[in-house]
């Protein structure tokens, strides 16, 4: 058994850790983006309705 090669369980542990970190990272980004998108959509809709109302006068 070569000294360079790590044990199999260690490799699996690292892979699982990496997977968890990536999943958390992606989930956080998506959540933040969703919140900002919703906020911007609400602001945009409000400004559009106001603009439409002003145009109708």
From Swiss-Prot:
Residues 1-8 are virion surface. This is Small hydrophobic protein. Plays a role in the inhibition of the host NF-kappa-B pathway. This inhibition occurs at the receptor level, by preventing the signaling of TNFR1 as well as IL-1R and TLR3. Residues 30-57 are intravirion. It holds the Pfam family SH. It is found in: Virion membrane; Host cell membrane. It is a single-pass membrane protein. One of its GO terms (cellular component) is host cell plasma membrane. The keyword Transmembrane applies. Interacts with host TNFRSF1A, RIPK1 and IRAK1; these interactions interfere with host NF-kappa-B activation at the level of receptor complexes. Interacts with host protein UBQLN4. It comes from the Viruses. It comes from Mumps virus (strain Enders). The keyword Membrane applies. The chain crosses the membrane at residues 9-29. GO terms for biological process: symbiont-mediated suppression of host NF-kappaB cascade. Coiled coil: none annotated. Keywords: Host cell membrane, Host membrane, Host-virus interaction, Inhibition of host NF-kappa-B by virus, Membrane, Transmembrane, Transmembrane helix, Virion. Belongs to the rubulavirus small hydrophobic protein family. Its main location: virion.
